[in-house]
Amino acid sequence: ENRTCIDDWRSLGLGLFGVADALVAMKLKYGSEKANAFMGEVMKMMLLTALRSSCDRAKKLGTFGKYRWEATKQSPVMDLVKELDPELYEDIHQHGLRNGTLLAIAPTGTISLLMGSYSGGCEPLYKISYERTTHKMEDVHGRFRVYAHSVKDLLEYHNLPLNLTDEEIIERFPWIVESHEVPFDDRVKLQAVMQKYVDNSISSTVNLKHDATPEDIFQIYMDAWESGCKGITAFRDGCRRGNILGVDENAKADEK
């Protein structure tokens, strides 16, 4: 049954991580128009490259089992391809695709940490520096300090000490912004720009301050839906105990 499902669809989920770190390195503020335009170009290139590769493999190995051109051509993705790369569109028409789906932006929380504390998926920097909780690493008990990869690189490049406060770092590099400081409508706009070129969904969590209201959360979901996002999550700081990532040890949630 599993083999049949795989042959029927051959779904892939090509993605990325380190978006926030890349924007910091390029001096682009997360959520700004320039940052959104840049990420749109990145995702457009990823989509067209993935489609070209899948089409080339279909020429040699055949399409996925459930492939039907009549259904495929109705996809919004194919409307984009027809506009952006007419030659690729015709090749897909002639030869089909090897894979039913191609792109997906996963959270990559653990993967990005293991690769060097890069930012996860398309998320903004959670914190310039933060404490992470673990229960499985030997010789590390409970919580340990982690610096955003791009921030550490900036400090080392400018020969600045790692003991600068977060506020001092932001003052020196004003394009750096933490997730709680990114307006939620800017978060949704960036995700919508990327979603345009992603055939699967995007994992994205809007981190809200403790005083966020139900109306704020409602607006996030409405904006995401209206802009074409396939999914989004809202997390209010302090809404549950034992957060894996802690903003402030002294920050207390309501007991209500």
List PLM regions with ranges.
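Generic secondary-structure signature for well-ordered alpha-helical cores
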Residues: D21-V24, L28, K44-T63, K127, ...
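Internal maturation/activation junctions in enzymes
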Residues: E1-R3, D7, K29-T108, G116, ...
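Residue-level recognition of conserved structural "scaffold" positions that shape functional pockets
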Residues: A20-A22, K34, G116, I128
